[in-house]
Every structure is written in C-alpha cells, then in structure tokens.
Design a protein with these regions (language model features):
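S-adenosyl-L-methionine
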Residues: 1-143
Length: 143
C-alpha cells in the first residue's frame, strides 16, 4: 500500500517553517520559469512535468527549471536548519511509483527518508512543547 495524504493527518500537523522572503521570491521565480517553459515547449503542466522528469530532455529552459527546483529545496532545507543535509538532486527511481514510470528529477531516496525522519522528530518536539504549555488538555499515551 502506497503513501496517502489526508489534510487532518498531514497538513494540519506539519511542522511548518516561518515565512521567509527568500522562499517567496523563489516561489515567484519557479512560477515564472514554469510558465516560460510551458510556452517554449508548447505544453501544459502535465506534459511539462513529464519533460522535467525525462533525462533525455535537456533543453536549456528545462535545465533552468530543474535548477529552480534545486534552489527551492536547498533554501527550504536551510530554513529548517538542515545545512548538513545532502539532497543529491538528479534522476532517481521512486519506488512508490508504477514500475513503468518511476524515474523523477528529485532528491535521492536516502535524502527523502532523512527528511521524513527529521520532520517526524520536529513534529514530536513541537507537539511536546504544546503539551508542556497546556495546549492539548489531557494527553493520552499509546500503549
């Protein structure tokens, strides 16, 4: 069974970082680079992402867009204080995807696992801080 996203379990408890102007700027850069790439490739979002994840597609505008993704990931990692984390961007197989379509331009599987572990730990720390401040009433412990 694959991973699932449910807002109540994922988004509402996600340990977010504080808003940073640099992330806003990179988000705008990503939006513009993606729009420009869609215009140059004459494709919509879905087909653009197929090109991004295809290592045979090496047009300059795709390389630029991939670099914006790398920059965004690096800045988010830094915002969490994880300067030590090696993201290892490249074309990697993603085991959760269908066998005939597993390659994505993304961070390595090891980096992905490490990020999930760090986010889990951070979520627990923040929750404990909230418990200590009395924000959750009586907390039940799991047996």
């Amino acid at each position: 069974m694959g991973q699932r996203y449910t807002p109540s379990d994922c988004f509402e408890t996600f340990p977010l970082i504080k808003e940073l102007p640099v992330l806003d700027a990179i988000g705008k850069e990503l939006h513009l680079a993606r729009w420009n790439a869609m215009q140059k490739a004459d494709v919509g979002v879905t087909n653009l992402y197929k090109k991004i994840h295809d290592k045979k597609q090496d047009e300059e505008f795709l390389q630029k867009l991939r670099q914006v993704f790398v920059s965004l990931d690096q800045h988010v990692s830094k915002a969490y204080g994880w300067e030590d984390l090696k993201l290892d961007h490249g074309f990697h197989e993603v085991s959760e995807l269908p066998e005939n379509d597993r390659v994505r331009f993304t961070i390595s599987e090891g980096a992905s696992r490490e990020i999930l572990q760090r986010l889990n730990n951070l979520n627990r720390e923040r929750y404990q801080e909230e418990v200590d401040r009395g924000l959750h009433g009586t907390v039940k412990t799991k047996k």
